[in-house]
Amino acid sequence: KSTLMKIIAGVEKSYRGEVVWAPGYSVGYLEQEPQMDPDKTVIEVVQEGVQEVMDVLNEYNEISLKFMEPMDDDQMNALIERQGELSEKIEHLGGWEIDAKLERAMDALNCPPPDAKISTLSGGERRRVALCRLLLREPDVLLLDEPTNHLDTESIQWLEAHLRQYKGTVIAVTH
């Protein structure tokens, strides 16, 4: 079962045949042993799931700081225009509520504290962080290999409810 998931995800290459996805489809895969940068914190890994939003917010904040610097009218107008574009994009992506969304997802999956280093986490804690990151990414196709391993009853119930309303395709391998 796990090998089939790896083939579908494009991780396993030693097989005959091919997996073809329609252009533009995104696929997210929760491995049994998720790979994460051990030097990062929990919140840094979880934020990877919403990287586009984080990048836009960071640029918006950088522009806000530039308003304190001296500049001419043309520079000021360019900054105002760019900040307006970014504000619209943030609104479209739901970026103004991203901190609350991250906190809800992390709480629901009983993730470790946001400032905990990945290198200090148990295997179960790492899986919960990886699952949180993946669900926030919202790929078109979710491939979940034993998604309930290491989850408590409350987290399993939350995950089941979340997957029932998920807008994409969900393929899960469970016992």
Task: List each language-model region with its residue ranges.
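ABC ATP-binding cassette signature C-motif
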Residues: 1-175
